Amino acid sequence: MLLLRTEVSYNDPPAAKPLIRNLIMKKLSKVQEKQQALVLTVADKLEAQAREEIPGMMLCWFDVEYHLFPGSLILFFQFEDEQSLEAAKPELLKWQKRLSAAMLKKGVILKDMRKHLTFTLQGPED
C-alpha cells in the first residue's frame, strides 16, 4: 500500500512547501506525480477556504493509494477540539460538494463524494 500523508500547511512559506513535500514522500511514477500534483492543488485551495470559513479548522491532509485513484482518495479536515468539530459537522456535505466540484474541474470524477472528505480530530501522524 502506497500511502501519502503530508503535513505541509497553508501557513508554511511558499518556497518551503516543495522541499517539505519532497522529504516526506516516496518515489512516484510520472502518472502518480501528476495525480499527486492535482490532489495537492485542490487540497491547498480547499484548506485556504476552510481556514477562513470554519472556526477551529487547523489542517487539511489526505490519504491515497495511487493504483486505486481516484476511488481511494480521502481528504481530512483536522480540527482543534471536539467542540469545533461538532460545530462544523453540519457543513460537511457542503465541503464534500466543493471537493467533488474542484476535482471535476481538474477532470477527475468522484463517484460518491461522501466517501472522499471527512472531519476529524486526528492528525496525519495519529
Can you annotate each of these PLM segments?
Residues 4-24:
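Short, Lys/Arg-enriched N-terminal segments with co-localized hydrophobic residues
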Residues 19-45:
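N-terminal presequence-like segments and adjacent domain-start helices
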Residues 55-78:
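Short edge beta-strands and adjacent turn/loop segments
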Residues 79-85:
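Short beta-strand-loop-alpha-helix junction that forms the active-site gateway
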